[in-house]
Regions:
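Acidic, glycine-rich A-domain
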Residues: 1-209
């Protein structure tokens, strides 16, 4: 709606700020059931070039970049101890506050520089910068790893160096047969596709023993 035109056809309309505000409130109200975990979380958004291509669940105009920003904001607004970062082939500075409207968040994420995809970076960054995290939540698409160290190895290195049994949740916004998590490690989980139940499932996984 905020773009003032449809993805299909030639329909156009005047964007009304009050409607944008109402849609924003409705989006967050839909996730009121998501409860905070009380854990320390690093929330990482993949901003690589492939995140701006294709569509999610056959919805025209809903790219992995838009979908991941929307879902990540649920966790960002719900949790009190959360650090939001962005990455591609390197860590990318991101300036987003909890009180920003969803359309503004999507716009800011869309303006970040593109690059490759290295899903190990959030763990390596946290280790290098002495960030204590009980869980890493990574939103990406189907291109999940193109770095020098596998994300599983990066998480294990973080656990070993910090002594924190951190968990890893990787959300692949585009459904395919990807897998990053070690199936033998109960502290890792892959989530595939765009699902409104994901934030609640992720919260339950983080607090589970």
């Amino acid at each position: 709606y905020g773009q003032g035109h449809g993805v299909r056809g030639k329909g156009e309309w005047e964007v009304v700020p009050e409607v944008i505000d109402a849609l924003d409130r409705a989006f967050y109200l839909a996730f009121q059931a998501v409860e905070p975990t009380g854990k320390r979380i690093v929330l990482a958004l993949d901003v690589s070039g492939s995140m701006n291509a294709g569509s999610i669940a056959g919805i025209p105009g809903l790219t992995p970049r838009i979908g991941s920003a929307a879902m990540a904001m649920i966790t960002y607004r719900t949790e009190k101890q959360v650090v939001l970062v962005a990455f591609s082939g390197k860590m990318v500075p991101v300036d987003i506050s909890r009180c920003q409207r969803l359309d503004d968040v999507v716009r800011r994420v869309s303006n970040l520089p593109f690059g490759g995809t290295d899903c190990a970076l959030p763990m390596l960054w946290a280790l290098e910068n002495h960030v204590q995290a009980d869980a890493f939540i990574i939103y990406t698409d189907s291109d999940t790893w193109d770095g020098h160290i596998h994300p599983v190895q990066a998480l294990r290195k973080y656990r070993e160096k910090t002594g924190i049994p951190a968990k890893l949740i990787v959300i692949g916004m585009v459904a395919n047969k990807f897998s990053i998590a070690d199936p033998l490690d109960a502290g890792m989980m892959d989530v595939v596709g765009f699902d409104t139940a994901a934030p609640q499932v992720i919260s339950q996984f983080i607090v589970a023993d």
